[in-house]
Amino acid sequence: MTEQTSTAPPAAPRRRRRWPWVVGIVGGLVLLGALVLAAVLIALSVGGGGFSSSSGSFTEEYVSGEGTDRVAVIPVDGTILSDNSSPEDGLPTTTPRGLESALDQAADDASVGAVVLRVNSPGGGVTPSAEMHRNILDFKAESEKPVVISMADTAASGGYYIATAADSIVAERTTLTGSLGVYIGLLNVSEAADDFGVAQNYIRSGEFKTMGDPLRELSPEEADIFQSIVDEDYEEFVNVISEGRDLPEDEVRDLADGRVYSGLQAEELNLVDRIGGLEDAVEVARDNADLEDDPTVVRYVQEPGLGSLLTSRFLPEPPEVAQLLSASGVQFNGTPQYLYVPGAIRSDLNR
């Protein structure tokens, strides 16, 4: 029997498909990039970046005048928030760090002889309002340059608080100001929670550790504690107005019952010095600083930061209910507020 051998070449080994590995690697890189981008967006959004909300230099926008002396106009727009706040509604806000940065730039510019703060704010947090008040006092003491407040549509509550640090206050006839007082907003959804059978259990270290829980009614003892905080902040507000406006404290208490005043009413009550617009405020600043007749007026402008641009483009909008609450200006975070709530709505609608 003859053995036959094949002369055909051996079959080539079958190549393994590598594309699943490639897809896996690419997918992993895409996922990693998305996570990094999300982390960057969150970090940037926490730092703010809206107008007057972050540190950094401001560009100058020419307003009027031809003189060598200059007056810097610094806008103070929107709700007053702490430096680490991150508003989600896109409304204008202002922070102590942003104001301090603008004032530092004006202090370092030898050609700037005076500053006008154009305030259009319903106020905001007690602490950031006090910080901005100190920023203005520190600027005046260190630079020896006068500061004049020019009130726009709204300069109420915390917006008025910061104004008391200025040398002069000029208000429009139609400005809404006043709302001199403090509140703490606490959300109460206890009835809705009962309807849906929702309850929250706490293991706490003290009787009042969970005071302000929105899932239950506030007890009388808890209300007294919150009221004591409001009373302390109210006394500080009265003291600031009394010192800044040279008014007796008893008279300030009569005025500071939470009501709003028009610009004309505020002038009659000595809460502002005169009626006028931005040009009038510049004139007062010029006279206070003894500048030449036609000083150059520039407005400090800060473009939206990278964080604001990226978050507004890529992050989803909050639910409609959250947007409505935020746009209303109502704060339910349990912290004291120098805030005129209807003023917040008005400021938003006028933009």
Regions found by a protein language model. Give the residues of each.
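Catalytic-core segments of hydrolase enzymes
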Residues: 148-149, 178
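Short gly/pro/ser/thr-enriched loop/turn and capping motifs at secondary-structure boundaries
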Residues: 155-157, 176-181
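Hydrophobic/aromatic ligand-binding patch that stacks against planar heteroaromatic rings
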Residues: 161-162, 192
